[in-house]
Regions:
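Terminal amphipathic alpha-helical/low-complexity segments used for targeting or macromolecular assembly
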Residues: 89-168
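Structural signal for interior beta-strand "rungs" in well-ordered beta-sheet cores
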Residues: 1-92
Length: 168
């Protein structure tokens, strides 16, 4: 079996709306919004400032980075790296969460750098392994770059696919 925490931890200033379910051994960061009717299975980790649209569900052991926006009705079966939006069925990358990032004081330059990283990951001809190596070697280190790369490296189930690319 799995070694459980024995508790679920919910951060500060979270909003959990009606009929949502958060299962055992989950960890939610601060300022997380869970809209009506969401289901979060056991052992899920959700980063700060993430918003889950209504009737979304996260598969057990899922990892969701910070500043993520999950569209309503999305079934989350893969990990979602920080700063992105996901939507559709099957779930796929839908751009970066630029509105959320601006609301939280990210400069246009920081947002542009995040967009550049995800362009290499999801809109180039490289697969995720090639893109992460390229980003690591060719882009200057920033807090966001390092966080994205660390998240991807530590994702046991793999990350969301790029829209229409079929690449993971």
């Amino acid at each position: 079996g799995t070694k459980a925490l024995g508790y679920t931890k919910i951060g500060n200033d979270c909003l959990i709306m009606a009929t949502s379910h958060i299962a055992h051994d989950c960890v939610l960061g601060n300022h997380v919004i869970i809209v009506n009717g969401c289901g979060i299975a056991g052992h899920v980790e959700i980063g700060d400032f993430t918003v889950m649209g209504g009737l979304s569900a996260v598969h057990q052991f899922g990892k969701i980075g910070k500043h993520v926006m999950i569209s309503g009705g999305t079934l989350v079966r893969k990990d979602i790296p920080p700063y992105v939006k996901v939507a559709r069925e099957p779930m796929s990358y839908a751009g970066i969460n630029s509105v959320g990032l601006r609301r939280r004081g990210f400069s246009n330059d920081r947002i542009f750098e995040i967009q550049k990283i995800y362009k290499y990951l999801f809109q180039s001809k490289m697969n995720v392994s090639q893109a992460t190596r390229f980003i690591e070697n060719e882009m200057p280190p920033t807090e966001e770059r390092d966080e994205i790369l660390e998240f991807i490296k530590n994702s046991p189930r793999g990350i969301v696919k790029g829209y229409g690319t079929g690449k993971e």
